[in-house]
Structures are given as structure tokens and as C-alpha cells.
Amino acid sequence: MKNVLPPFIEIYRALIATPSISATEESLDQSNASLITLLAGWFSDLGFNVEVQPVPGTRNKFNMLASTGHGAGGLLLTGHTDTVPFDDGRWTRDPFTLTEHDNKLYGLGTADMKGFFAFILDALRDVDVTKLKKPLYILATADEETSMAGARYFSKTTALRPDCAIIGEPTSLQPIRAHKGHISNVVRVLGQSGHSSDPARGVNAIELMHDAIGHIMQLRDSLKARYHYEAFTVPYPTLNLGHIHGGDASNRICACCELHMDIRPLPGMTLNDLNGLLNDALAPVSERWPGRLTVAELHPPIPGYECPPDHQLVEVVEKLLGTKTDVVNYCTEAPFMQTLCPTLVLGPGSINQAHQPDEYLETRFIKPTRELITQVVHHFCWH
């Protein structure tokens, strides 16, 4: 019942006080079950039907889908329930206590992005959801900060096909209609160890990796020359060498060397094509040294994403906000939601505060975000 729904700031406070960290390191990783229970209770109080979905392959993680209304189409509002880990020594405040100071709300997840659910709940407390003419769906996903397992699983298993979706990531209320993808790979070279006094008796993995890196750099230059999307601030696919490790002693021929790298493809570039380009680039090394070079995924790949610029969702949101949609270089769950329906990324707070010590959301976003949610629900679910 709506009269038992807590005030906006208390909802926000409860969300921040409920840890839901995602991490690849098991000791840091946390279940989001408690947070899902909170959200499920609140949306039930608003009259929504609530379904909690276990996400396979995770450490006790769940999605939640709250729905109201009947028929086809409608609107999906979605976001992730998890946060990144925090560096205790760099925070000046308790990350799990919502702190109001200097027109800012501080806490882990205030901007990225647990707070978005407080905005949705607050905007809907005055809406009679029984009178909506089209369905309204609220999706809370798991593990966005690591594998995006929640969004991947939901998009593969749901039969829902809303008219459109909005992901409430922190965009400073600037609507985003496209972003790059992300592919992270590990290149491994297996050499043959031996005493450094006789190099011919071994195969130095560092030397082979040096050769491989030269070919990878040629691929980087080729991607920059062949592909272009003017709307992006970095208008070409980027390739970054992020981490390398090999060997264990100066007087020993290096037996193993490992390189971690990523590629951020433009929308429209297929992941299979990029994998093919990387394998082609490394083919000369593999041919010279059969069986000594392998490439594997570090994390599941994320494709690039683009919402058609002439879609009704883009037109409506641009009109409501009085601003044009934009594109960004970072990734969200949008590619997976886009398989269900046209999707925009649009939410309160700045991406510059995401993953930072003393994360905060400026209070100036509160009123316009509440108004925006009310307006898009009215447009897509009442008309």
C-alpha cells in the first residue's frame, strides 16, 4: 500500500545501507538477495506483481522483475543492483551510510546506480498503476559490474517485448543512444625454460610475446584507419594493452608470458569479426611457433549498442528534456536490453562519480529525475 512506502530519502538510505558488491574476487563478492527483498517488498506495496529470478552461474545473485498492466508493449525501466568494491582507506565517509552534505548525497551506489530505484519508487507513489493502459515493468539486475550476468540471463529467457526501455545509469540526465562494446582477452605464450647461459636450449616466451605485440599494434592501427563513427569523442575502435607478466628470474629463459588486452568496438561491429581480426593478426606468430600461442576471453564480451535515432523513444525523450541524445565510450547493459526493444541510457548523477571514493549524487537531480520518470510513464503507459 502506497501510504506505507517510506519517504524518498529513507528509501535511498535503506538501499545504500544494504551492501551488494560485485567482484571477481570471491572474498569481496556479495549476494544481492537482501537488496532484492527490499525492492520486491516496496514494489509489491505499490501494486506490482513481483518475480525474483535466480541468476545461474553467480554466487547467490538474483534479478527482480516488477510488472503491472496487461497487453503488449509498454515501458521497461531498468538498472543494476550491485556496486563495485570500495577502498576503505580512501573514503572519508561510511560508504554504507547515506550522508547529506553540501547539496550532495554520499554513499556507495548513490550515483552508480542503486539510487535510481529510489527515484522510480518515489515517482510511482502518486500513480494509480491499475489504470495504466499499457504495461510498466521495473527490472533490477545482478552483477552488472563484473559479468553482466543478470542482464544477459534476463534477455535470453524473457518473453517480454516492451515498446522501449530506459536504463537509469548516471548520465547527468543526458540521454545516451549508443555506446561502444568491450572485449577483454588474454594472450598466452608458452615457451621452454632453460639456463640463460645457453639461449638455444630454450624458447623465450617474452621474445615471442614481443613479436606478437608487434602484430597486435598493427591491428590497432588498422582498426583506427578502417572504422570511424564521428559522433564518438574517440571515433574509432580502441585497443589497449593493459597488463603483461612473464618470467621469474633474470638468469632463466622465460617459459611463460601473459598479456591482458581489450578492444572497444563501435556499434555495428560484430564480436566474431573482431575475434577473427585478432586471430588473423597473430597468425604469423602461431605459424612460426605452432602450439605456443593461445588467445582466450578474460570476461564475456559486450557488443556495441545503438538505438535508432529516429525511434519514438528518442524523439519523446529529446522533447521532454530539450536536449539531443549523445553517444559514449563506456559500456552498460543496453546491448542486452536492445535485443528486447529500443533502449536509451538515461539517469541522474554523473559518470565521473562512478567507481570513485566518496561517490555522490547531487541533489539538483532529484526534482527533474522524478518529473522525467513521471512523464515517460505517462507517455508510454497511458496513451
Swiss-Prot record:
Keywords: Amino-acid biosynthesis, Arginine biosynthesis, Cobalt, Cytoplasm, Hydrolase, Metal-binding, Zinc. GO terms for molecular function: acetylornithine deacetylase activity; zinc ion binding. NCBIfam families: AcOrn-deacetyl, PRK05111.1. Homodimer. It catalyses: N(2)-acetyl-L-ornithine + H2O = L-ornithine + acetate. It comes from the Bacteria. GO terms for cellular component: cytoplasm. Binds 2 Zn(2+) or Co(2+) ions per subunit. The active site is at D82, E144. Zn(2+) 2 binds at D112, E145, H355. Zn(2+) 1 binds at H80, D112, E169. It is found in: Cytoplasm. This is Acetylornithine deacetylase. Pathway: Amino-acid biosynthesis; L-arginine biosynthesis; L-ornithine from N(2)-acetyl-L-ornithine (linear): step 1/1. The lineage of its organism: Bacteria, Pseudomonadati, Pseudomonadota, Gammaproteobacteria, Enterobacterales. Its EC number is 3.5.1.16. Belongs to the peptidase M20A family. ArgE subfamily. Catalyzes the hydrolysis of the amide bond of N(2)-acetylated L-amino acids. Cleaves the acetyl group from N-acetyl-L-ornithine to form L-ornithine, an intermediate in L-arginine biosynthesis pathway, and a branchpoint in the synthesis of polyamines. InterPro entries: AcOrn-deacetyl, ArgE/DapE_CS, Bact_exopeptidase_dim_dom, Peptidase_M20, Peptidase_M20_dimer, Peptidase_M20A.
